[in-house]
Amino acid sequence: MAPRKRNSRGVSFIFCCFRSSEHPEITYRLRNDSNFALQSMEPALPVPPVEELDAMFAELVDELDLSEKHREAMFALSAEKKWQIYCSKKKDHEEGATSWPEFYIDQLNSMAARRTLFAMDKEDEEERNKTIESLKTALRTKPMRFVTRFIDLDGLTCILNFLKSMDYEIAESQIHTSLIGCIKALMNNSQGRAHVLAHTESINVIAQSLATENIKTKVAVLEIMGAVCLVPGGHKKVLEAMLHYQRYASERTRFQTLINDLDRSTGRYRDEVSLKTAIMSFINAVLSQGAGVESLDFRLHLRYEFLMLGIQPVIDKLREHENSTLDRHLDFFEMLRNEDELEFAKRFDLVHIDTKSATQMFELIRKRLTHTESYPHFTSILHHCLQMPYKRSGNTVHYWLLLDRIVQQIVIQNEKGQDPDTSPLENFNVKNVVRMLVNENEVKQWKEQAEKMRKEHNELQQKLEKKERECDAKTQEKEEMMQTLNKMKEKLEKETTEYKNVKQQVAELTAQIQELNSRTVCAPGPGGPPPPPGAPGGPMSMPSGNFMPPPPPPPPPFPGGMAPPPPPPPPPPPPPGGPPPPPGLPLLGAAPPGAPLGLSMKKKNIPQPKNPLKSFNWSKLPDNKLEGTLWIDLDDAKVLKILDLEDIERTFSAYQRQQDFFVNNGIKQKEMDCTDDTLSSKMKVKELSVVDGRRAQNCNILLSRLKLTNEEIKRAILTMDEQEDLPKDMLEQLLKFVPEKSDIDLLEEHKHELDRMAKADRFLFEMSRINHYQQRLQSLYFKKKFAERVAEVKPKVEAIRDASKEVLQSKNLKQLLEVVLAFGNYMNKGQRGNAYGFKISSLNKIADTKSSIDKNITLLHYLITVVEKKYPKIVNLHEELQTISVAAKVNMTELEKEISALRNGLKSVENELEYQKTQPTLPGDKFVSVVSQFITVAGFSFCDVEDLLSEAKELFVKSAKRFGEETNKIQPDEFFGIFDQFLQAFLEAKQENENIRKRKEEEERRIRMEAQLKEQRERERKARKAKENGEEEGEFDDLVSALRSGEVFDKDLSKLKRNRKRIVSQTTESSRERPVTKLNY
């Protein structure tokens, strides 16, 4: 066979591509006898010694990753030929950057980013395709180091990303076919093939290319996937890829697209045999390789998918093409099918099983299982299948689909629990399920025990959380107390020092005054004799009266500027909601005082109801104010005789009737007539409720969420929630259900019926018995929220303080303002120019000035460019003003309101503490001790906040004046907001400048790469032309070629033909049943 020649640099398809227009050309073709036909060439350098040449040539052959047969052929060459090849390789190594993988990877990424051929001319498309073709040639012909380098740089991932990101136009172009060719060329190398198979999604992405209408691309994809089936570990990957393609292409079933393409016979598919051959070759590889080599069940399982898609009629139609290669694949499919069906039928002592007949298949199963332990389960399966829903709905189909997949899984899964096909049911291991069925009782016991342990765990978890809350609260209190103690120590030391200094100054001044007085006594004035000692107005009276030793220092002020505890106050005022009680007012529930002597009112004879009624909440007119009113002339006794008192009693009874259930039959008992007192007393539970219905309902909801008894709630309030039973949100809700004066009055009237009170009523009644219940609750809520509220306020004050310091101390800000001032004076003329300063709000107007060259460029963009060059430190201005953004969100008015609320709340708690000190201590009442400790700690914490606020205000005023702002007209949020807005605009403009710079660099890089590419294409023109004339195939190509021609199935096909003759002979003799060679599905 004549050798194929190339018109460019010498290329060996299986070895390497040696490109050089200067060196002599080598052309050869590998034959079966391993001889080469080489064109003579003159090496440019002298031939080295034989030993040195052999060592150099051995290094070259090792790089080519050749098989042993090909290595021997290479070493059989003469010394001159070896030297020629080595020189060409050396020249190839010295070529430019475009001959290295980095160049191709950059081009692939660039093309993938552009994604579309839209608005591109034909020349651009051809250039892109030439680049990919050049990569394909390099992967086939370059030394091993090129392929290794390409793999190390994630070249395969670049190709796959390009395949995934293609639009429709590229997918239907030659570029798509060339990309698949690159993968095929990469797999023609042992390392490349291993890398493709090891990649997590390579085969899936290759399978996605079946969606194209480009026939060449489809054929290339099918050839690759068919060959992968022949590679160890590749068969299952192909099946997974086809399942992936089913989801990708929204197929109803797997392999649907293949059968559709196989059946298409219109348009360009009418005489298209290559695609149909490739599909049949792929189907045969899927059926006969992988687990199908050994497992009959697996082959039957997979083939059934194709038969259900209607492949048999399509095969009959394909016979009309009369193509020998295609017929070879069709023969193999049918013979393998007949062989498998015969072997399967032997299991049931038959020649053929009609899998289209449900009756025959049922009978075979029934006969096989009769008189076995499995038969009851078989009948159970049939019985429950009869109970399956048969209505035409979406769920019905899915029930049968689930049953089908479970049976498939049982059939194809091997003994080790491994699935040769993609699992019909994920995470479904038949062996494990069987083991679980055997140990079902044991599993049930473990589940019960696990449930018990789970409940115990939850209970312990709740207890642990409760203890953790207690520990956290105690730890926080301890930390606050330690901080307060340290601050008190510092303050005491400071005041002690000041006191000593003042005392020393007073002593010095006293000594000076005494000295002056003594001098005055010794030298009397000329006005007459001095007055006698001790006389009024005499000089000696001053030291004795006015210069006594200084008194001891006063005690330290009370925390928070509060006065020391005053003497016990008078009795507490009444609860809110009513006027203060006048002197002599009887206690709650006692009889009212008698009428005044001037008007004696006779007690009315008013009928009494049998049961308590809801009260009419009126304001009673006192007897001493009745005289002279119309009330004297009214007689309600007449009206009472007319009214239906029983109906009133039924309608406004204080009892709430609740429906109950019969114990025996569980039927809900309807409300009975009130006249049947005997039956009513048995069927209904009476509850006394005088509280408003909606309020009582909301109170019940709150109590159910608390999950505490009234006694536990009472204990928590008295002990100031020592055990952390009352969360802050629950305390806030409890404050909404404080017993009011009207509620207390009504509840006191029925306190003798405590056991019959409704849940909400009893709760309100028992809470009303706590002295100052509302004030205690408010104090407890304030105590729990105090640290949180201080933690919310303090960062806001600190933000104003720190932001003021930052703008005062920032050198870069000062420098920036100086630069902006210079820009402004330069750009502005007339009255707007010649400025010594500007309002800081002008900073945010810099971006309003647009460039006259590019409207997207503003003065701010330009300013940043200048700053980066001339004042690089200013670029990091935001690092010096880190607190600005926080301070810009602080409203001073709202902040002062929050601090004032804290001050008032602290004062209220202090007042309640003073009141409780005057009251007798109840058992378990810890209000005084807990709150006293809290007031001490909270007072010092609040003093810190107030001092911090004063410092922040002072610094803000200083910073505002510093920038020429009027402090009475600008607030911190507005002042710092100006800087914050400017910094954001500054950083955004800086990023935009960076993006513009990157785009410019990318454009320059693209132009440079295109120039290199153009030069590379010119150098490789001859090499591409030689490639079009034909290429020697490598290992993977040999596999693809054998699969395409059907040679890979020749051995199996011959065996099947012999078996077929034997089967026909046996069938003729036995005449039991005619073998079926074709089944139409």
From Swiss-Prot:
Residues 696-705 are annotated as: Actin-binding. Residues 538-547, 586-600 have a biased composition (Low complexity). It is found in: Cytoplasm; Cytoplasm, Cytoskeleton, Cilium basal body. InterPro entries: ARM-like, ARM-type_fold, DAD_dom, FH2_Formin, FH2_Formin_sf, FH3_dom, Formin_Homology, GBD/FH3_dom. Residues 45-418 form the GBD/FH3 domain. It holds the Pfam family Drf_FH3. Gene3D superfamilies: Formin, FH2 domain (1.20.58.2220), Formin, FH3 diaphanous domain (1.10.238.150), Leucine-rich Repeat Variant (1.25.10.10), Nucleotidyltransferases domain 2 (1.20.120.330). Keywords: Actin-binding, Cell projection, Cytoplasm, Cytoskeleton, Wnt signaling pathway. One of its GO terms (cellular component) is cell projection. Residues 1013-1029, 1070-1081 have a biased composition (Basic and acidic residues). This is Disheveled-associated activator of morphogenesis 1-A. It comes from Xenopus laevis (African clawed frog).
